[in-house]
């Protein structure tokens, strides 16, 4: 029997309106037996105008189609080539509907027997990919795609990815492939037929040694860490000297001193606070101290960071470099809380649950493939979003471990003694519960970027009740006996009657009525919240595009909560004495929902700080109620300070006014800390100049146009004189976008790449910024820190405004109860810290040279200016107008040109 041929099709069109728009380019790549066997490509003439957006997206201009055929001239040829093939496309509905319409206009009835959507295929085959856009997939799998949104290249790329996916399926254990087949019957297209053929043609073989089996699940075996065999007879200085020499790094006595201080805290189980200026190489210092501690004592160290970026830098760059220099194995791994790791029993329960829901079906297939690949069992590898994430978290919350369960966190616990360095982040450090956490595994902890710890603690102490979440959780139960969990109860009652099961009768109608009453009570609860929002003073957050209400009477909400909790308690009593599996599943779901309401009710009764938020003022469905359950100081004391014998807090910005007292206030205990303010900086006054314009008017929020124009004028002067890259930091998205619009309109920036901060794209934007010689990056809060600005020439950082949090910020509201003076004790130190972090973006090594421009005149006229001025002590300072700025730039450019 001949193997099927796949016609992988991609179309470019004048738009996405099927009834109006037309095809302007077609690309087809033919695949048989996982090999590309041919291609077809043609531009297609149209009498429609090609919109500018489409021209920009596809790089197809109207004159490129002048000599191209109309579709009707090549329709017969295309039809002959794809007839009998499996029709394949990425997001197939678009391409299939357009080509069927175009064929129909040529009196050709095209109806492919089988259709496959590669968007569906790739979601299943590549469960850990962060994006399923074609360009992102190509990059992730090493396929070169030079011209995205050109039909011929997109079709070829899709075909190559399809082959990779098929080969992956064919390498899976047979039992896994069979399960994928049964699940794929619930998908939208014909992937099940393709998987069936793979099963039918599968070469019988025993299960590979790489795999093991738990119930019906085939999973990749975990390989234990081997005990490290480190042979090094020297002290820390010898270790530091060897590593710096082997890696070609500069020997820095102050960096060695920092490492020695950290080692001393570890050796004597001390608690310490260390400020080591930005660019001082502190991560290298604490890694070597941790390694030396392990060599001398056999004990291991936990290192906590605040970003995934820094985690990845430690695990993928810094630690491998040290391994290479020393030529011996270092066991270092990422460690999280227990709930972040998968239990195979949970996967088994998810697979057993009957559901025809499309997203749940995709998730089940993803889990089956992921568990054959993962070494860690880290659930975040799946990057679940939307409905899948809500479904999985609900299953995780209600999961009761089965007998002989295999939990991946136990792998970490089992190997703890052989892990020399554990890497975690602040969120996991604070979230972990004492009975199943990383605290059992490590006595010693180093917390890098410790100044960010309170922010993560604040997230941890805040509980949330959202309309969307509760609606989803109730939806899993269903509203009628033909839906979801209610259907399983109805089937159980029918089974009881027909098979005379020895269980009490189930009042399905009564249960259904109760469930609908709970739905109504939930609607009433959020209607009450909606009415409160509409009648209250509303504050806006432009960053997250949310609206907030802080001052309101919680009594009406408490009344509605009491009613819904009472109804849920009565419903739970309905299940008393029933132990059937289906009953347990429904009861667990009601318990989960009830606990969510009870936690919020208790906090409101205790008069904890709370606020309401709404994304769309006209949609009740976007409401969230947030309540602060604990003080940040309490959680940091109990969850961090009390849990480790040795604890070192380290940051480039840990002091305020040259004192650690502000950071000490985050802990409830009067405890002695060793404190060190270390001058390891490589910055000399000649490297950096801080320029403060005196010709920029004070910021006025009612009219910021003049302020924005002044900023742009200074940027123009900089790029005109220096012709190098520039980072501009904002505290407002509105101002950032105003500057962006002006820059994009001006001819002075034609040669520049202008990049703007985007959600979930920061890492990629930083890479792009660092790769261009002429680039301007506009960013807000996240770019004030944790960002390595690379440039061969003069570097420039412009700070539009001092980074004070808005007094309507939720953080301000939530933290108000913990301070006598919120501004002096919290807001001002936070702003100074962020300002110092912003300054630190500029000089990261002894070779860097640059200029900082701070436009906010509060830096020189406010009654708190001295706290910011202390941040500028190590820099040359100049005040002047734009002409003096230009003179300074010319001088810097001349000095930089003299560098060897």
Curated annotation (Swiss-Prot):
State which Enzyme Commission number(s) the record gives.
3.1.-.-
Give all residue intervals belonging to the Exonuclease domain. Answer: 8-161
In what residue span(s) does the Helicase C-terminal domain sit?
Answer: 714-883
**What Gene3D superfamilies has UniProt attached to this entry?**
P-loop containing nucleotide triphosphate hydrolases (3.40.50.300), Ribonuclease H-like superfamily/Ribonuclease H (3.30.420.10)
Query: Motif range for DEAH box?
Result: 448-451
Q: Which Pfam families match?
A: Helicase_C_2, RNase_T
Which molecular function GO terms apply here? 3'-5' exonuclease activity; ATP binding; DNA binding; DNA-directed DNA polymerase activity; helicase activity; hydrolase activity, acting on acid anhydrides, in phosphorus-containing anhydrides
> Which keywords annotate this record?
ATP-binding, Exonuclease, Hydrolase, Nuclease, Nucleotide-binding
Q: Where on this chain does ATP bind?
A: 276-283
What cellular component GO annotations does this protein have? Answer: cytosol
- GO process terms (BP): DNA replication proofreading
Residue intervals of the Helicase ATP-binding domain = 241-496
Q: Which HAMAP family match?
A: DinG_exonucl
Name the job this protein performs.
3'-5' exonuclease.
Q: Which PANTHER family match?
A: DNA POLYMERASE III SUBUNIT EPSILON
Concerning its family, UniProt says: Belongs to the helicase family. DinG subfamily. Type 2 sub-subfamily.
Q: What is this protein called?
A: 3'-5' exonuclease DinG
* Species annotation: Staphylococcus saprophyticus subsp. saprophyticus (strain ATCC 15305 / DSM 20229 / NCIMB 8711 / NCTC 7292 / S-41)
